[in-house]
């Protein structure tokens, strides 16, 4: 896996998402309900469904550590596995590494621009779902943010240096106008 271009001509990106990617690869399996659903589509033969029923990733993963600067056209993750196994994990790896690397990179740029002043993450209200909020806050922390308004992320990572960063609700704005 590699990327071709750094967003906004930034020179480099910050690797993030590896922890979730490895966890996904380790735990990927197909439940009976999954197999039954695929069987109901009428396009998969029994041999393939049996393969999925017993699936366990057998490949090797080589990756750049999280928080490391990465550059265009250089491998950030390599999967050495049978093609079918690599294909089964490809989409999740792309969406996870791309999403978190983008956020970690932007956070890192903001932190560097702040020149030593603390930067806190408040992205949960704009995230596309609860998992994206937690993963995004985690990525911002990897990028250098000192804390998050996402209480769940703070609980999981213990990343906020303060008691609670909180957030500023839209209703507060309306009341003060």
Segment roles from a protein language model:
Residues 5-7, 43, 49-58, 66-177:
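Buried, small/hydrophobic-residue-enriched core segments of structured protein domains
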Residues 1-43:
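Intrinsically disordered, low-complexity, positively charged segments
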Residues 26, 58-60:
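N-terminal, charged/glycine-rich beta-strand/loop interface patches
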